[in-house]
């Protein structure tokens, strides 16, 4: 992945910041090639060619719409299962489909320790604990970390019956245009566009990669700070040094934002170990940085059934 691919891929993130809400990273497919071209300094045609290349490689294969779990009165929890053999992952992926509430799993290498991060929804901590016990039974090692809450901003909208119908249509056909969605729901284009944009603006749902998309070769870098007050200066130094860096938003990785977070997080290219290690050394040398933590994404699996069933419960069947 060259710097231009990385810059274009970053431009698909709302505000240029990465967010991981209940699984894959958020993207904004509405961003026109013209706007991306202005950001990265190439022609519109050049952007389209690069996007087509990323699609052929599988990184932008399909799109999905994920509803906000708060719409259904549930929160997201995450637990990690240790992985000792690469062959264990495929079986765990299959078994997770049998666990109620599992919505996403990511195979990661976290500072040399391989583990499967399992995201699932739950009404409360006691239900989360029971699902954690089920996950332990699926673990080849018989181990799982205690489920912990994974913070996501709540939806700001109380959906109307029409909102549910629009959300249902968009979820079933994420590649459809707004006009096609409006026809499916049986409303005007103007009403369809207004409802569609309102759902996104109030965080009732968001766009992400399709379930069959390949994991982009990125590493999550978390920089521990000596003093939270150093956060802005460290972030500025990263930009001044010209390091390839996609900042993770404060509300983007499962931790409720605080006024002065004690770390800076970002995504960096990980397809070249040599380049990555060079970047890690530079991060560690930044004034105010006391720790560099790396997490690599090796693969993932989506489980959309739970969300699909909950949305369908709010949409009367047509006869």
What are these regions (language model features)?
Residues 1-319:
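A compositional/biophysical signature of low hydrophobicity enriched in polar/charged and small residues
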């Amino acid at each position: 992945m060259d710097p231009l691919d990385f810059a274009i891929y970053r431009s698909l993130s709302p505000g240029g910041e990465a967010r991981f809400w209940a699984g894959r990273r958020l993207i904004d497919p509405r961003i026109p090639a013209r706007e991306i071209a202005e950001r990265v300094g190439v022609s519109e045609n050049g952007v389209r060619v690069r996007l087509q290349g990323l699609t052929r490689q599988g990184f932008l294969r399909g799109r999905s719409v994920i509803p906000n779990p708060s719409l259904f009165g549930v929160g997201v929890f995450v637990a990690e299962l240790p992985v000792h053999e690469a062959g264990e992952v495929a079986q765990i992926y299959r078994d997770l489909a049998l666990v109620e509430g599992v919505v996403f799993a990511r195979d990661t290498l976290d500072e040399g320790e391989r583990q499967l991060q399992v995201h699932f929804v739950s009404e409360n901590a006691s239900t989360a604990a029971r699902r954690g016990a089920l996950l332990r039974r699926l673990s080849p090692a018989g181990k799982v970390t205690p489920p912990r809450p994974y913070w996501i901003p709540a939806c700001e909208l109380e959906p109307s019956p029409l909102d549910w119908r629009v959300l249902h249509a968009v979820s079933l056909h994420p590649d459809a245009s707004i006009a096609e969605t409006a026809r499916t729901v049986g409303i005007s284009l103007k009403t369809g566009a207004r409802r569609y944009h309102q759902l996104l603006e109030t965080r009732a749902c968001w766009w992400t990669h399709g379930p069959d998309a390949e994991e982009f070769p990125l590493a999550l870098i978390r920089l521990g700070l000596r003093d939270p007050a150093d956060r802005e200066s460290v972030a500025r130094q990263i930009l001044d040094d010209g390091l390839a860096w996609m900042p993770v938003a404060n509300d983007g990785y499962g931790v409720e934002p605080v006024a002065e977070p004690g770390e800076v997080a970002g995504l960096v290219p990980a397809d070249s170990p040599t380049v990555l290690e060079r970047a890690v050394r530079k991060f560690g040398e930044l004034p105010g940085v006391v720790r560099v933590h790396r997490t690599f994404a090796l693969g993932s699996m989506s489980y959309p059934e739970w969300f699909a069933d909950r949305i369908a419960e709010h949409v009367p069947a047509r006869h």
